[in-house]
Structures are given as structure tokens and as C-alpha cells.
Swiss-Prot record:
Gene (UniProt): thiM
Native source species: Shigella dysenteriae serotype 1 (strain Sd197)
Name under which the protein is recorded: Hydroxyethylthiazole kinase
Sequence positions that bind substrate: 50, 198
Cofactor(s) the record lists: Mg(2+)
Keyword check for Transferase: yes
Length: 262
């Protein structure tokens, strides 16, 4: 199984495109991470919007550059709004990304996520346990936490990508991004990133934004992983723990965008 590495030049090129296009991202995400997700997108130059009312969610999905569906704090009313948004996104050809949080541990969200797959997401982002569960290979994970190594989920990710047509992202110590044929690996980051709520959810929002960019979607999505890992490394070098990590992380994302414009 061949895994290619993303080049720094491609990552920088995609970040330049990101800043040029400033995608409007409709984030239907969980209650815990909304502020951090919005700030992450803003730091990179995107425009976030959190619209959750069913009628408005459908309407906004038609005008957004991209849509994110994150099922962490899923409720029946929220599922109804998400379903309406995804239906409209498909009709409007708005690329949408699925973050199937804890899909291997809980039945309701597993059934809901499988239902949404019929609406053809542009991308799916999860940890190893989530991707394996969504692919039907295993039911696992400890809530939102993975119990599997990212590399172990590559075959499941490739299968899921081929079956759905989505770019599939498996995050971990090393991230893997695949379209079912090509697989790209992204190294970097720091274990401290896992001690801050929302880094994975925010990545899903950046992945969604990258699906709206022109060019090679696989490389664009892989670039999103690279930026987050780069910013994480820089933030850890400047912080003393999780509390001071977040502002340094947002600053690091901003600095990355300034560097590609210099």
C-alpha cells in the first residue's frame, strides 16, 4: 500500500487559494466547539456561519461555499435540520463534509450518518475508530475517543472513499487522506492537541472549506491537515499547557496565512 507525503509547496499553494477565495462555511457543528471552530476558520481567512434552524439551514446551504455536518451533540430536531441542509446542499451542488463523531459507539447517530451518506458527501473526517465503524468494518471507539491507530484504518478509509465518492480523512499521530486510489500521509502535530476540545472538529470545518476550492480536492484536503498540524507544533512550542495553547494556536494559523502572502 503506497502512501505519498504532501509537499510543503502544495500546502502553501492551497493556503494561498484559501485566502483568495475566503470560503463561506455553513457549520452545523456541536455545541461544545462552535466558538473555537469559528475562530479557526477566521484565523485562516474563511467566513464561518452557524445556522441550525431547519428552514434557515436549508436556505443557507444553498448560498454557502461549503457545509459541515458534525453529529457530536446530535438531537432529533438537529438531525432534522441537518438532513434538510444536506438535501439542499446536494441539490445546489454545495460540497458538504461529514464528521461522524462517536459513530461506532452509539446506534442513533450511526443510523443517521449512514442515511446521510446517500447524499454523497465531498469529504468525511474522523478518527480511526469512527472511519472503521462508518465503513462497517468494526464497531468501536470509546465515545469520541479512538481505540485504533490511524494506519489500521487506511483500508476502511479507502473502501469508504470508493463506495461514497468522498475524500476520507483519518486523523491521528499521522493523518491519512484518500480518494480510494491515492493515499496521502501528513505527519506533525503534537499530543497536546488531543488535550484541547475541538481541534478535530475544527479540522473538519477547514476540510469542508477546502472542498470548495478549485484544483485537486485530495491535495486541498490534505493541506488542511498540514496547516492544523503545523499550527499545533508552533503553539505547543509557545504554550505552557492546554489553557495557553488555544490562543497560540489561533495566532499560528494566522501567521501561516501571512507567510504565504509575503
Amino acid at each position: 500500500m503506497q502512501v505519498d507525503l504532501l509537499s510543503s509547496a502544495q500546502s502553501a499553494h492551497t493556503l494561498h487559494l484559501f485566502h483568495q477565495h475566503s470560503p463561506l462555511v455553513h457549520c452545523m457543528t456541536n455545541d461544545v466547539v462552535q466558538t473555537f471552530t469559528a475562530n479557526t476558520l477566521l484565523a485562516l481567512g474563511a467566513s464561518p456561519a452557524m445556522v441550525i434552524e431547519t428552514e434557515e439551514a436549508s436556505q443557507f446551504a444553498a448560498i454557502a461555499s461549503a457545509l459541515l455536518i458534525n453529529v457530536d451533540t446530535l438531537t432529533q430536531p438537529r438531525a432534522q435540520a441537518m438532513r434538510a441542509a444536506v438535501e439542499q446542499a446536494k441539490s445546489s451542488q454545495t460540497p458538504w463534509t461529514l464528521d461522524p463523531v462517536a459513530v461506532g459507539a452509539l446506534d442513533y447517530r450511526r443510523h443517521f450518518c449512514h442515511e446521510l451518506l446517500s447524499f454523497k458527501p465531498a469529504a468525511i473526517r474522523g478518527n480511526a475508530s469512527e472511519i472503521m465503524a462508518l465503513a462497517g468494518i468494526a464497531n468501536g471507539g470509546r465515545g469520541v475517543d479512538t481505540t485504533d491507530a490511524a494506519a489500521n484504518a487506511i483500508p476502511a478509509a479507502q473502501t469508504l472513499a470508493r463506495e461514497t465518492g468522498a475524500i476520507v480523512v483519518v486523523t491521528g499521530v499521522m493523518d491519512y487522506v484518500t480518494d480510494g486510489r491515492r493515499t496521502v500521509g501528513i505527519h506533525g502535530g503534537d499530543p497536546l492537541m488531543a488535550k484541547v476540545v475541538g481541534t478535530g472538529c475544527a479540522l473538519s470545518a477547514v476540510v469542508a472549506a477546502c472542498c470548495a476550492l478549485p484544483g485537486d480536492m485530495l491535495e486541498n484536503v490534505a493541506s488542511a491537515c498540514h496547516w492544523m498540524k503545523q499550527a499545533g507544533e508552533r503553539a505547543v512550542a509557545r504554550s505552557e499547557g492546554p489553557g495557553s495553547f488555544v490562543p497560540h494556536f489561533l495566532d499560528a494559523l494566522w501567521q501561516l496565512t501571512q507567510e504565504v502572502q509575503a
